Amino acid sequence: MAMAAAASLLPACAAPTLPGRAFRPRRNSTPTASLSCDGGSRGRGVGLGVILGGGRAQGVRRNAAAETYVPGSGKYIAPDYLVKKVTAKELEELVRGERKVPLIVDFYATWCGPCVLMAQDIEMLAVEYENNALFVKVDTDDEYELARDMQVRGLPTLYFFSPDQSKDALRTEGLIPIDMIRNIIDNEL
């Protein structure tokens, strides 16, 4: 009875995803207000995973009907979005190649709650800056070596590359407001 009462106090996004299954909070977790996922912990007891009651943020897949399951991988692939997922080789070509617009790279993981939240903002910015910036994303689970080489320690991590290759890239880590991303694109690059 106490478990049902505790589950009713959780936000709607923390409700059980399977019918008939009771919500069971993790015993060894300590609630945290962090909005980033530590890259080395794979979501165990960090950030929204703890707040939402488990190692993985529950309810991450917003529209399961629109996604395709990849057998054997345990992953769902979303339909095409404006922000293209790139490989290490493709990213290297984009960074080293000549661009007339800034390049924004989102390092994310499918199990990272803050990454899912930021992905929505990144998609909106891709529409807003359609001809004035290029947005791409890198799945750190698929491109582990690249993430390590780029020193991605927490998720989400954004890199901002100026079209002027003499300027250093800017980096942010964790969930940041959409206005801060706009400010970096408009004023820093």
Swiss-Prot record:
It is found in: Plastid, Chloroplast. InterPro entries: CITRX, Thioredoxin-like_sf, Thioredoxin_CS, Thioredoxin_domain. SUPFAM superfamilies: Thioredoxin-like. Residues 72-189 form the Thioredoxin domain. Its EC number is 1.8.-.-. Its main location: plastid. Probable thiol-disulfide oxidoreductase that may play a role in proper chloroplast development. This is Thioredoxin-like protein CITRX, chloroplastic. It comes from Oryza sativa subsp. indica.
